[in-house]
């Protein structure tokens, strides 16, 4: 039997060799399956602010903004004119911008991850709300941090400040120059923090901005703010009334997450096109809907927190931008639902529905940012007051 097996093996070797001589190659092994690429975003439809189920809102004359002291829901557009405060003005004191760099090698909280280039993930066949990502790996990063210190800042005093996502944000600094000079907002420092790279599930940015926990706020508190105070020779207030968060898209949901999980640190929130949807990764059993849970159950079922919130969404904001179809990826509906539950709980908030506006619409920001900053900072009396 043993000799027969040897003969068979020899015959096979001869046949393979003959095929190669005749120019015929053995069939190659099948290539391993490639991870799914991120799908292209579909063009969102324009949504009607008067759709049944949306919040009742006051439609303003085209080109105008809500008053800076007005709570509630408002409709603006369809044209978006740049506010005068968004332009550098001669004679207005200009703040100093310090440009810092942070490395993942120095972070105890975020050592860094990234999704392989050209990959995304696949939906769990058993759970449409869960994205399986197999191509996210430890990856180092560097981030920029731009710190705006107004000309009027008095050295040694504890200053109010605003923390912004996806920095640096030069337009914020221009607005603050003008608003501070006109005494419409306090003399504040702005800390515009770059993200750790990438976007959405499996990326460092997604981990920072979409995770429903206090971790990013803790990173800012323990790693960013001490660096800012040391390198920029400033003192930052510990008073949550003098601290604000700001962002767009996932940076907007991050702004809300920071204040929600750490209201002892932040009382003021400003968001454009907030990603209050199911984008958290990895999935967390405590908040299975990610930031969708804000309006689904967290805000409705929690005691009112001392937050003042300004928020905006565009009529052409994102709708199912990736392959997940879990009924929790509608940015317009998410922000409408946020406005509804905030009103029901009695929060001070202003919600702007912008017509003829897309996701993180630049024209809308140029029109509304000065008024949004005024609204968010309304009622601030100063350090220790």
What name fits each language-model region?
Residues 24-44, 385:
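Disordered, low-complexity segments in secreted/periplasmic proteins that are enriched in proline
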């Amino acid at each position: 039997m043993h000799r027969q097996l040897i003969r068979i093996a020899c015959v096979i070797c001869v046949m393979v060799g003959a095929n190669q001589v005749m120019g015929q190659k053995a069939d190659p092994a099948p290539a391993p399956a490639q991870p799914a690429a991120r799908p292209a975003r579909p063009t969102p439809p324009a949504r009607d602010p008067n759709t049944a189920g949306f919040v009742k809102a006051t439609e303003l004359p085209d080109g105008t903004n809500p008053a800076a002291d007005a709570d509630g829901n408002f409709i603006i557009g369809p044209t978006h004119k740049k506010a005068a405060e968004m332009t550098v003005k001669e004679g207005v004191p200009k703040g100093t911008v310090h440009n810092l760099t942070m490395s993942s090698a120095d972070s105890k909280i975020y050592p860094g991850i990234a999704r392989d280039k050209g990959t995304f993930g696949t939906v769990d066949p058993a759970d449409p709300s869960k994205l399986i990502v197999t191509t996210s790996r430890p990856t180092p990063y560097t981030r920029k941090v731009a710190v705006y210190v107004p000309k009027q800042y008095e050295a040694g005093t504890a200053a109010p400040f605003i923390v912004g996502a996806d920095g640096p944000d030069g337009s914020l600094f221009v607005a603050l120059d003008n608003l501070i000079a006109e005494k419409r907002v306090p003399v504040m420092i702005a800390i515009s923090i770059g993200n750790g790279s990438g976007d959405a599930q499996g990326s460092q940015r997604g981990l920072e901005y979409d995770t429903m926990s206090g971790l990013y706020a803790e990173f800012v508190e323990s790693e960013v703010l001490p660096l800012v105070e040391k390198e920029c020779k400033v003192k930052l207030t510990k008073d949550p009334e003098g601290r604000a968060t700001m962002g767009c898209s996932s940076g907007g949901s991050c702004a809300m997450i920071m204040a929600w999980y750490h209201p002892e640190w932040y009382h003021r929130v400003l968001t454009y096109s907030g990603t209050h949807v199911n984008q958290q990764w990895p999935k967390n059993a405590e908040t299975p809907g990610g930031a969708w849970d804000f309006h689904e159950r967290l805000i409705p079922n929690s005691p009112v927190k001392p937050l003042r919130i300004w928020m905006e969404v565009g009529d052409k904001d994102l709708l199912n931008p990736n392959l997940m179809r879990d009924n929790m990826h509608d940015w317009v509906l998410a922000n409408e639902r946020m406005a509804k539950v905030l009103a029901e709980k009695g929060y001070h908030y202003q919600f702007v529905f912008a017509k003829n506006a897309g996701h993180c619409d630049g024209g809308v920001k140029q029109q509304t940012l000065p008024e949004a900053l005024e609204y968010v900072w309304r009622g601030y009396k100063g350090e220790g007051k």
